[in-house]
């Protein structure tokens, strides 16, 4: 329930040391593997490569099938699409999917994020201005304040906004009807959502990491839109190093394009892509300096682990949330890192990739 004053307010402003490889990880040059959207990717060029319909959206077949059924059913009944919660690692296309839903339903959409909805009037202003069928996309929805969540409860269930006008004995509750809308929430931490909020979503879907062949198609499509010549092998080379994430694939493509242009290359071949990505310290498995530093700390300083998250964060200079949400999921997916109740451990594959020999006790377990 929102509390709104009737007075107008002014605007606010351990074991034996292992043999070290010949070359230790160098200091990072640029974080080209961070899946968070960069400033230069918020302009027209980013929008130009973003798919506008399901036919152009590569990958996530299971998700597209589920949403296609939901859209067709809602259209046939003349109803709005049910509220949808999308969760998964950053950069997999949650925002893009919300835009495609609006396009497929033939409605408008509004995009915001939970940290921007600090005060009740922030979310109230969005809700009262929604038109019938509109889609409201809230990114990082797990970071909503308790008061904002409580405003959303009746809005999601009954399309109603309950507000308290005035204070003290003169206060009164007023219900404002809202247009029927669809709330699409996105989060990287679905477990952080409160049960009352999570249970109000009719559809809860997970986005998975992409396969190399899917990312190759994304790279080729983006290259065509960016008017850049990329060979199939060049696209595959970029895709292999993109950590299963389309946003990273598109970012690496732009960096490789810059490299090819400066080197006067007419097209991006596999060799050119490999040379460019080596310059940016992205290895053939998609690991960057922070990934290698994490594995190096676990292997060299703690004999393979287990190591606590806070210790890894201190050694790499990253915060614990970034490590948990950005780096660990991919390292676990490719089998380089394991999470145990006692901490993080490096796997045999990680030892091999980093150029170390696993200790005997770990070899017996693997």
Swiss-Prot record:
Annotated EC: 3.6.4.-
Region Head domain (RuvB-H), residue ranges: 284-366
Keywords: ATP-binding, Cytoplasm, DNA damage, DNA recombination, DNA repair, DNA-binding, Hydrolase, Nucleotide-binding
Positions that bind DNA: 339, 344
Recorded GO MF terms: ATP binding; ATP hydrolysis activity; four-way junction DNA binding; four-way junction helicase activity
GO biological process: DNA recombination; DNA repair
Cellular component annotations (GO), alphabetically ordered: cytoplasm; Holliday junction resolvase complex
Region described as Small ATPAse domain (RuvB-S): spans on this chain: 211-281
Recorded domain comment: Has 3 domains, the large (RuvB-L) and small ATPase (RuvB-S) domains and the C-terminal head (RuvB-H) domain. The head domain binds DNA, while the ATPase domains jointly bind ATP, ADP or are empty depending on the state of the subunit in the translocation cycle. During a single DNA translocation step the structure of each domain remains the same, but their relative positions change.
Record's protein name: Holliday junction branch migration complex subunit RuvB
Species annotation: Trichormus variabilis (strain ATCC 29413 / PCC 7937)
Gene of this entry: ruvB
